[in-house]
C-alpha cells in the first residue's frame, strides 16, 4: 500500500492524541521517513497542526452526529475528517472518501455516515470558545478585557498560522520571531 498524506497525518495525530507526543517533534520525524512530495508534506503539516489547533471545534461537530462515544482511534480519524470538511476547504467527496479509506473495516461505515452528515449540515456553534476551539477561560478573559467584537477578532487571528520565513542558511522561523532576524538577513519565502 502506498503511503498517503492523510495516513501520515493520522499517524501523527494518533501519537499526539494517544501517546501525548508533541506535534512539533512527531511531525518532522514522520515526514523525514516519508516519501511524500513537498506539496503533500505541506498538506500533512496543515492537517496535523490544524486538526490539533481546532480539536475542540472538531469534537463539537462530531458530537452532534454520534450517539455513543467512538473508540479513541475512530475519534481521531473523525477529527481529521471534520477538520478537512469544515476548516481546510477540502472538497467533501475527497475528504470523506480519503478519510474512510483510513478507517478499519469495522468502523468504515460509521466514519462514512458521520462525515457525510458533517459535510451537509451547517454547524450552529454554542459559543465563540467552541467555534474557535479555545478553552472557556481564555475566551472569557478576552471578552472581559475588550469588546466582544475585538475579543472574537483577536481569537480568530490567533488561529491563523504565522507566515514562515527562511533565511539563506536554511533556518526557518515564524514571523512572530522576526526580531531575531534583525541582525541576520532574511528572505520571505
What are the residue ranges of the model-derived segments?
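Rossmann-like S-adenosyl-L-methionine
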Residues: 167-189
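Class I Rossmann-like S-adenosyl-L-methionine
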Residues: 1-169
Amino acid at each position: 500500500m502506498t503511503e498517503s498524506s492523510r495516513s501520515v497525518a493520522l499517524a501523527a495525530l494518533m501519537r499526539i492524541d494517544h501517546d501525548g507526543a508533541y506535534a512539533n517533534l512527531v511531525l518532522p520525524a514522520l515526514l523525514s521517513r516519508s516519501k511524500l512530495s513537498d506539496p503533500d508534506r505541506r498538506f500533512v503539516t496543515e492537517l496535523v497542526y490544524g486538526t490539533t489547533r481546532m480539536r475542540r471545534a472538531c469534537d463539537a461537530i462530531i458530537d452532534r452526529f454520534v450517539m455513543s462515544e467512538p473508540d479513541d482511534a475512530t475519534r481521531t480519524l473523525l477529527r481529521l475528517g471534520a477538520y478537512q470538511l469544515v476548516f481546510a476547504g477540502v472538497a467533501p467527496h475527497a475528504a470523506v472518501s480519503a478519510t474512510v479509506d483510513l478507517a478499519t473495516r469495522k468502523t468504515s461505515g460509521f466514519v462514512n455516515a458521520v462525515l457525510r452528515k458533517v459535510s451537509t449540515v451547517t454547524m450552529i456553534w454554542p459559543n465563540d470558545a467552541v467555534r474557535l476551539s479555545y478553552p472557556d477561560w481564555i475566551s472569557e478573559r478576552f471578552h472581559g478585557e475588550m469588546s466582544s467584537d475585538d475579543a472574537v477578532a483577536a481569537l480568530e487571528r490567533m488561529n491563523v498560522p504565522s507566515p514562515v520565513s527562511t533565511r539563506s542558511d536554511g533556518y526557518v522561523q515564524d514571523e512572530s520571531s522576526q526580531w531575531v532576524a534583525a541582525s541576520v538577513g532574511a528572505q520571505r519565502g
